[in-house]
Amino acid sequence: MAQAQFRDYVRLVRGFNTFTRMVHCDCINGYAVGRKVSLGKVTGDLAITIFVNKKLGLRRLPLPNRIPKTIRLPSEKAKDGVLEFITDVREARFSSLEYIARERPAPSGISIGHVNITAGTLGGLVRDRESGDTVILSNNHVLADSNEAAIGDPILQPGPYDGGTDPADHIANLTRFVPIDFAADAENRVDAAIATPLNPNNVIWNTKDIGPETPATVRHLGESDLGRFVHKTGRTTEHTQGFVDAVFATVQVKYDLFQKATFVDQIIISQSPAEEAFSDGGDSGSLVYDSDNSSVGLLFAGSEGTEDEPATTIVNPMNYVLEKLNIELLSSGDHPSS
């Protein structure tokens, strides 16, 4: 029965033209068969996942553009002559270059990197409490080349791997970083750095696919937050969703063939089997938010999935990032505008 139901869903999704005419909406970017997500949690129900530019309330949508909660189609094999399909609408825009291109002003969630690395993600904008400047936040290994950089080094957007060159794409200078201690008995809490834009008008307080960055709120995670919905936008996997799998984690992170570092009090993010991996290489530096868009932490590492285990993502708790770098979140009244 379950396999037959799944095949019915696949047949409907493959009928792309028929389905497009059915919903009469040119803002749809794609379809898939997945599990229904309700309140940020994956349910056991199969659903037609419909990717749209932006989810809007019914009152803001013309009648022909409204996607029904269920789709009913006549079928001779159904007992009552009708097959019913659940729908699940999600926001997603698919583009091969959007997150690795040069952008001015540069939003968060796109390619950036120290002149000597490959590329990571521009996490967000914060305030440097020492200078009062609005600065770019990302990882040490993205902006400071894993301790190898010098203060004042050029930061490129996009990162070198994505075609960024100096001086054409020089967007900021390295300001400060928290050194990563690779000693066997050391305990690290953050992989973090900041850079000051050459021109404040070249950055914007906005995260791709999420919108204006969160007001000055930080989500401190505890036991009650296990399973909490989170999301991020990164250079490689773009906008993804996941959930808090574990907290207060101690992990060993490999930086190259010879260097490993231990991190404590970390957050582990996973995702349901129906979802793509929460992160991949190049997403380092992404800011992770909860459903209220409160800051959860700074993404910096992860593991690949296997047949039996999902991929996982490691996140520095945001309170440690703010403390160690001596920075603070921007408030809604003082962000750079586009």
What are these regions (language model features)?
Residues 269-270, 277-279, 289-338:
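C-terminal subregion of chymotrypsin/trypsin-like serine protease catalytic domains
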Residues 34-37, 236, 302-304:
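Flexible, active-site-proximal loop/turn residues at the rims of small-molecule/cofactor binding pockets
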Residues 58-75, 206-217, 311-317:
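Surface-exposed flexible segments
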Residues 57, 143, 318-321:
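A generic structural signal for short hydrophobic patches within well-formed alpha-helices
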Residues 97-272, 276, 281, 289-292, ...:
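Serine endopeptidase catalytic core focused on the charge-relay Asp
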Residues 1-126:
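Noncatalytic regulatory segments and standalone regulatory/sensor domains
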Residues 14-24, 69-83, 130-131, 182-186, ...:
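Intrinsically disordered, low-complexity coil segments
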